[in-house]
């Protein structure tokens, strides 16, 4: 917003001298034709209508009101429609572009070659008075305050969607505008630097590494006959931080390799390092693969070949009432004769000789 230049509003006053501060008299008619026709460049200027004897625009001064004269014939129409279509003010009066009434106030506002009452210039969205604002914006003949203009027509970041202000650092890519911090890889979230290669896929920025990964994913799915979209081929932040473990290829053995290892297993199921090295040289396999094969074979052998255990009947509880005290005749003895068991042999001979006497003796519980 700027004040109109003093020389732009010098009025030719009949019967009065043009002051020394103004331009010469012969230049005044040409300037008068520019008073109502010069664009305001999207800014509102507070103008004193008429300048009295001095003929200068002075928003802070006071004087008699005189109309401006023009050297060129002006349109007699003073309706709001004619003013909105770009016509200049008719001689002798100025019409407000908002209410259509003649402006007889001491001050007026001039925006984009149109005249306004100070009270009539307002935002077309929020209806805020712009009489004391330093600037205003025009779009399709509508007046906006700064806030509403940027809300409706301002540039937004293609990543975060927030407004980009004139003081923000930005990066541009294929017509898209990004905040400096928002110009980062979609997959790894790393901010890209100047001169670094990047790709723009469906409005998403990718660094070179993850762009190649996306192409590999698309190629692999096409080869497998699976349909996949570009969105599905993109790696997300979770996939980057927690990648899925790659499946290990299963090791296959030839008949000759199996024959060599099985022959060694029959001799020694837990070979040492030297034997493993010899087997690796003979079979062409790595020591680690052979060692794992022997571990698996030992586990299978231990599982299928277990020591023989005698089968026993399940033990069941018997009520104590059904139990009877054991009798001597129910007990079977087998004599164990060691090499120096002479005394034990004599004892057993004595017990056999007096068996009848023992059978007739009563049995008493031990107290």
UniProtKB/Swiss-Prot annotation:
Region (Disordered): 44-79
GO biological processes: female gonad development; forebrain neuron development; forebrain neuron differentiation; learning or memory; odontogenesis of dentin-containing tooth
Matching Pfam families: Homeodomain (PF00046), LIM (PF00412)
GO cellular component, one term: female germ cell nucleus
Parts forming coiled coils: none
Residue ranges flagged as DNA-binding region: 246-305
Biased composition (Low complexity): 68-79
Keyword Calcium: no
Span of domain LIM zinc-binding: 96-148, 157-210
InterPro entries to which the protein is assigned, alphabetical: HD (IPR001356), Homeobox_CS (IPR017970), Homeodomain-like_sf (IPR009057), LIM_Homeobox_TF (IPR050453), Znf_LIM (IPR001781)
GO MF term list: DNA binding; DNA-binding transcription factor activity, RNA polymerase II-specific; metal ion binding
Cell location: Nucleus
SUPFAM superfamilies in alphabetical order: Glucocorticoid receptor-like (DNA-binding domain), Homeodomain-like
Record flagged with keyword Protein transport: no
Chief location: nucleus
Superkingdom, taxonomy of origin: Eukaryota
Keyword annotations from UniProtKB, A to Z: DNA-binding, Homeobox, LIM domain, Metal-binding, Nucleus, Repeat, Transcription, Transcription regulation, Zinc
Entry-linked SMART domains: HOX, LIM
Biological role: Transcription factor involved in differentiation of certain neurons and mesenchymal cells.
Protein name: LIM/homeobox protein Lhx8
Organism: Mus musculus (Mouse)
């Amino acid at each position: 917003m700027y004040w109109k230049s003093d020389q732009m509003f010098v009025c030719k006053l009949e019967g009065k001298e043009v002051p020394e501060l103004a331009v010469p008299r012969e230049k005044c008619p040409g300037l008068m034709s520019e008073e109502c026709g010069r664009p305001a460049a999207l800014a509102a200027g507070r103008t004193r209508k008429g300048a009295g004897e001095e003929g200068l625009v002075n928003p802070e001064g006071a004087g008699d009101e005189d109309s401006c004269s023009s050297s060129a014939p002006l349109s007699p129409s003073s309706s709001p429609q004619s003013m909105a279509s770009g016509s200049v003010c008719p001689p002798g009066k100025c019409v407000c572009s908002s209410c259509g009434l003649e402006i007889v106030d001491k001050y007026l506002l001039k925006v984009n070659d149109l005249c306004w009452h100070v009270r009539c210039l307002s935002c077309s969205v929020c209806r805020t008075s712009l009489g004391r604002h330093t600037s205003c914006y025009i779009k399709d003949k509508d007046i906006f305050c700064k806030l509403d203009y940027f809300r409706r027509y301002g540039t937004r970041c293609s990543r975060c969607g927030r407004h980009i202000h004139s003081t923000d650092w930005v990066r541009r890519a294929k017509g898209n505008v990004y905040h400096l911090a928002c110009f980062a890889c979609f997959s790894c979230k790393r901010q890209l630097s100047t001169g670094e290669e990047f790709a723009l896929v469906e409005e998403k920025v990718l660094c070179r590494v993850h762009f190649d990964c996306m192409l590999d994913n698309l190629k692999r799915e096409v080869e497998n006959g699976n349909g996949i979209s570009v969105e599905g081929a993109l790696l997300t932040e979770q996939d980057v931080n927690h990648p899925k473990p790659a499946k290990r290829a299963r090791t296959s053995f030839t008949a000759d390799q199996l024959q060599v290892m099985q022959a060694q297993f029959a001799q020694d199921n837990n070979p040492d390092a030297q034997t493993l090295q010899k087997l690796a040289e003979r079979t062409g396999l790595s020591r680690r693969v052979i060692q794992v094969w022997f571990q698996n074979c030992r586990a299978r052998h231990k599982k299928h070949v277990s020591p023989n255990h005698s089968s026993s009947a399940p033990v069941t509880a018997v009520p104590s009432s059904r139990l009877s005290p054991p009798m001597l005749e129910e007990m079977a003895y087998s004599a164990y004769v060691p090499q120096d068991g002479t005394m034990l042999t004599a004892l057993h001979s004595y017990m056999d000789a007096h068996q009848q006497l023992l059978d007739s003796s009563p049995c008493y519980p031990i107290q």
